[in-house]
């Protein structure tokens, strides 16, 4: 299951994402976050990725938000508010 999820995200990154302009407000991007979350936390990582996508909208400043070591659906407490520092 984990491999299928990873292949799905990589296919999105290669074939679908290039069709639209970059719009993610976070570093790493939401799709890269999803990949890392799945690699670290298995199928629960998909929930983390979905929560991250729901947080990524024009009304947030964004910033550096790495995948936490422990499973959590909340934004990383160590998140930098300034994405340009990444």
Curated annotation (Swiss-Prot):
Primary site of residence: membrane
Source superkingdom: Bacteria
Coiled coil: none
GO CC, any one term: plasma membrane
UniProt KW Membrane keyword: yes
Keyword Membrane tagged: yes
Disulphides: none
Record's bilayer topology term: Peripheral membrane protein
Subcellular location: Cell membrane
Keywords in alphabetical order: Cell membrane, Membrane
Family: Belongs to the UPF0161 family.
HAMAP family reported in the protein's UniProt record: UPF0161_YidD
Function: Could be involved in insertion of integral membrane proteins into the membrane.
Name of this chain's protein: Putative membrane protein insertion efficiency factor
Species of provenance: Streptococcus pyogenes serotype M1
């Amino acid at each position: 299951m984990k491999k299928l999820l990873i292949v799905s995200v990589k296919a999105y990154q290669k074939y679908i994402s290039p069709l639209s302009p970059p719009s993610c407000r976070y570093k790493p991007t939401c799709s890269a976050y999803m990949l890392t979350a799945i690699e670290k936390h298995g199928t629960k990582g998909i929930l983390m990725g979905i929560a991250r996508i729901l947080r990524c909208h024009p009304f947030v400043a964004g910033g550096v938000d790495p995948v936490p070591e422990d499973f959590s659906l909340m934004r990383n407490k160590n998140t930098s508010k300034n994405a340009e520092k990444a």
